[in-house]
Amino acid sequence: EIEALGQEITWENIGDPVRKGEVPPKWIREIVADLVDQADSWAYCDSQGVAEVREFLANEVNRRDGVRVSADDIIFFNGLGDAVAKVYGFLNREARILGPSPAYSTHSSAEAAHSGYGHVTYDLDPYNGWMPDVADIRKKIQYNDSIAGILLLTPDNPTGAVYPREIVEKIAAIAHEYDVFLIADEIYANIVYTGAGRLHMSEWIGGVPGIAMRGISKEFPWPGARCGWLEILNKDKDSNFAHYVDSLLAAKRLEVSSTTLPQMSIPRIMGDPRYPEHLDARSKQFSRRADEMSGVFAGCEHIIANKPEGAFYYTIIFEDGLLDDSRSLSIENPKIREAVERMTEGVEPDKRFVYYLMGATGIVVVPLSGFQCAHHGFRATLLETDDKKRAWIQKSLRDAIDEYVASSR
């Protein structure tokens, strides 16, 4: 509606690097083009995934220190959205998964839909770099015996936080103590630009049963491929967990197969000697953009703007209690101003800011209240490839924050 009224829109709400202008390297596109000419890339594959690809991915896991897997521990899906729906949908009805807050909506909505209740969460602490509150995790599990598993996203969406080994090992120890399994959404595992480096679930989970969620959408990047997989860890450690995993595979077999061509590309692309260089170059690129973002918001009063260390996003929160319905941004176009005033009636305080931001600047970000979070703020991305436009986006956000905070004084 705002766009129809004449405001040019800048989309900062979706993590699609290709849509934001990133072009996958030519050598990756050439591999995919070559595979299109192979007849078997047009056929169904095994329901669990192409056998050779699963063998390749199992070997990749086994190159690390930690849990060993086989090709039978890899299950392909049509993107992680498909995998997430199955992972939550085939739990026992009364079983709950404890997830982080801010909560990525794909997980939180699927878990809530499965259980019929609101998603149960533990806190990520914005005053400590968005690290998980381990004491809160323990408390939530200790007093809720319906919790069957703990979810982590690392690197995290929406905060960009990357959890150090000491934190995830503490969470694994709690899972072991209370006999629950772990889920790690690792779709951004190779997009890390902190000095700590990349850390994979198989390296820190120990003997706890777990599921690592992986895919190619963010790191090739090829979001349109809809190709993701689960790495099943320590299936043999718990019979209930083994039965649950078998139910996931049985459900997958009813769908015949997942997309064949993207699977077939994985060994050729990930096994190419240019791939590590590709990952490192992208990490350095996002590191530079994170530095830019951190510099723009440094010294900005009334907010917390933690510098991201992985993934594509950063999250900014306002001081608790700061936002209210007396604040606004100046909007020159009267029709847009009228539309925004109508849209903001009775909405969450951060959603009000987001609507005014869209009306005033055309920039679309995601309110943090949409991530089942008690803090008010928003998520934006580091994906804009045009340096001047990215600088404009970040400066516009900073200016909008300053104006909005001052508007009711």
Give a label for each model feature.
Residues 12, 57, 74, 97, ...:
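Generic structural signal for small/hydrophobic residues in well-ordered secondary structure
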Residues 206-287, 291-296, 300, 304, ...:
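Conserved core segment of the aminotransferase class I/II
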Residues 5, 177-178, 208, 361:
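Helix C-cap/helix->beta junction micro-motif
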Residues 59, 63, 67-68, 328-409:
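PLP-dependent enzyme catalytic core of the Aspartate aminotransferase-like
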Residues 267, 283-294, 304-321, 327-341, ...:
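Conserved glycine-rich beta-strand-loop-beta hairpin in the small C-terminal domain of fold type I
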Residues 124-198:
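Active-site phosphate-binding strand-loop segment of PLP-dependent enzymes
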Residues 90-111, 139:
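Conserved PLP-anchoring active-site segment centered on the Schiff-base-forming lysine
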